[in-house]
């Protein structure tokens, strides 16, 4: 399947010369993601509180540091060695480092240097379509969603101006506006501040006025997705969060995790347990 494959480029109807792909799968091949997952399956961390998360060709190293640690430790060296042994080149320019620390007096994290190049330290990073910031406020993610929604209002208003049937307008709203708001919804919506939440609620209210019919509120959509996701975890023994859902001796209610901070209280597991117990 991989041996002797050729490829070429087409620009304005003209084709380039054929070239042989010597060490990669054909671009656009439906098997390429699966083959890459199989190839990188053995890349995993055995270090305590150090995890290597992979989704297709996106790889993230997550480290839980104690009060005296300021670096990822040996997991970085292990990952670089694995890349070298697996004939994979790490693009240092695209590699970013972000430290999430809620303490007021934050120690400066150690600088990461790979092949003589310093890895850029950032305050926010877009991972799998969602902006994460170093305080987990999701403000940048909310601003990005709001900006995209504003751009799509133009098309929705055009449909209203042309007196398109409300059924088609609702279909457009759910496909191009609601879908971008509710993407990875259960991860961040409950953690939003009132200002950011009102910003997204305004998108729904403006859309409802343009369509002429009220649309489902974001809180209702969030609870539906949260309930569905929590139930899927409860029926999947292999899910990493399965053990976080523990039933009380009565067997009818789940044990609510003790939350010292509002940040943890509004995170996924406590929110899901509260909803399931309601």
Residue ranges: model-predicted function:
Residues 1-26, 63:
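Conserved pre-catalytic core of RNA-dependent polymerases
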Residues 12-15, 89-123:
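Short, conserved micro-motifs composed of acidic
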Residues 23-33, 65-73, 89-91, 118, ...:
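Conserved, non-catalytic sequence blocks in retroelement Pol enzymes and Pol-derived host proteins
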Residues 28, 43, 52, 57-59, ...:
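Mobile genetic element proteins and their domesticated derivatives, centered on retroelements
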Residues 33-63, 180:
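Active-site palm subdomain of RNA-directed nucleic acid polymerases
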Residues 59-84, 102, 137:
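Catalytic palm subdomain of template-directed nucleic-acid polymerases
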Residues 116-186:
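Basic, alpha-helical interaction scaffolds
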Residues 190-278:
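Short linear motifs embedded in intrinsically disordered, charge-biased segments
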């Amino acid at each position: 399947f991989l041996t002797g494959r050729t490829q070429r480029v087409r620009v304005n109807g003209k084709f380039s010369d054929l070239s042989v792909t010597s060490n990669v799968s054909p671009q656009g091949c439906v098997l390429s993601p699966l083959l890459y997952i199989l190839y990188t399956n053995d890349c995993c961390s055995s270090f305590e509180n150090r995890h290597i998360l992979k989704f297709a060709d996106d790889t993230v190293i997550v480290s839980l540091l104690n009060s005296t640690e300021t670096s990822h430790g040996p997991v970085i060296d292990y990952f670089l060695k694995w890349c070298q042994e697996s004939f994979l080149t790490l693009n240092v320019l695209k590699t970013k480092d972000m430290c999430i620390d809620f303490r007021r007096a934050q120690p400066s994290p150690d600088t990461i240097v790979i092949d003589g190049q310093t890895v850029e330290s950032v305050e926010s990073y877009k991972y799998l379509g969602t902006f994460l910031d170093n305080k987990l406020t999701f403000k940048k993610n909310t601003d990005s969603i709001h900006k995209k929604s504003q751009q799509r209002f133009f098309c929705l208003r055009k449909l209203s101006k042309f007196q398109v049937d409300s059924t088609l307008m609702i279909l457009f709203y759910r496909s191009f506006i609601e879908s971008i708001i509710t993407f990875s919804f259960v991860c961040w919506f409950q953690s939003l501040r009132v200002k950011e939440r009102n910003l997204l609620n305004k998108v729904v209210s403006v859309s409802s006025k343009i369509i002429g019919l009220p649309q489902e509120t974001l809180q209702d959509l969030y609870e539906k997705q949260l309930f569905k996701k929590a139930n899927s975890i409860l029926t999947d023994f292999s899910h990493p969060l399965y053990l976080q859902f523990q039933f009380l001796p009565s067997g009818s209610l789940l044990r609510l995790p003790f939350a010292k901070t509002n940040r943890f209280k509004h995170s996924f597991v406590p929110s899901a347990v509260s909803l399931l117990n309601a």
